[in-house]
């Protein structure tokens, strides 16, 4: 069971960058998936979650700045990319109905987004 992020790159501040998390070995219809980021020199910051049902929940600071969606095998994170969004972005499988990082059981390696 694994997840892997993609889509990170050097970009200018512009709407429309989408990061993709591809999962294998488990079904997104059975698990909740979160997105987390880590800016250079800072700690982990939880962005939001998409539940197995397809509904979403976001950290208060992330509302309106990020959109999480999914297909049968991918979980996407779309961001409008202000410069402070430079970070490594991770997707993670979370315990059902939980929004706490302590309950993550599968992490991806992350994808780096540099906004310049």
Swiss-Prot record:
Cysteine pairings via disulfide bonds: none
Keyword field contains Transmembrane helix: no
Keywords carried by this UniProt record: Adaptive immunity, Immunity, Immunoglobulin, Pyrrolidone carboxylic acid
InterPro entries, per the entry: Ig-like_dom, Ig-like_dom_sf, Ig-like_fold, Ig_V-set, IgHV
Pfam family, any one: V-set
Family annotation (Gene3D superfamilies): Immunoglobulins
Keyword Lyase part of the UniProt annotation: no
GO terms under biological process: adaptive immune response
Record-annotated Ig-like domain positions: 1-107
Record-listed Pyrrolidone carboxylic acid modification sites: 1
GO cellular component, one term: extracellular region
Miscellaneous section: This gamma chain was obtained from antibody to type III pneumococci and was isolated from the serum of a single rabbit.
Name listed for the protein in its UniProt record: Ig heavy chain V-A1 region BS-5
Organism this protein belongs to: Oryctolagus cuniculus (Rabbit)
């Amino acid at each position: 069971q694994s997840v892997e992020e993609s889509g990170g790159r050097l970009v200018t501040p512009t709407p429309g960058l989408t990061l993709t998390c591809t999962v294998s070995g488990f079904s997104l219809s059975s698990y909740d998936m979160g997105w987390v980021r880590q800016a250079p020199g800072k700690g982990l910051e939880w962005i939001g979650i998409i539940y197995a049902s397809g509904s979403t929940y976001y950290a208060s600071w992330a509302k309106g700045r990020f959109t999480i969606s999914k297909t049968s095998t991918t979980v996407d994170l779309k961001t409008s990319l202000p410069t402070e969004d430079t970070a490594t972005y991770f997707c993670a499988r979370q315990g059902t109905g939980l929004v706490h990082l302590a309950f993550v059981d599968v992490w991806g390696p992350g994808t780096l987004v540099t906004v310049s």
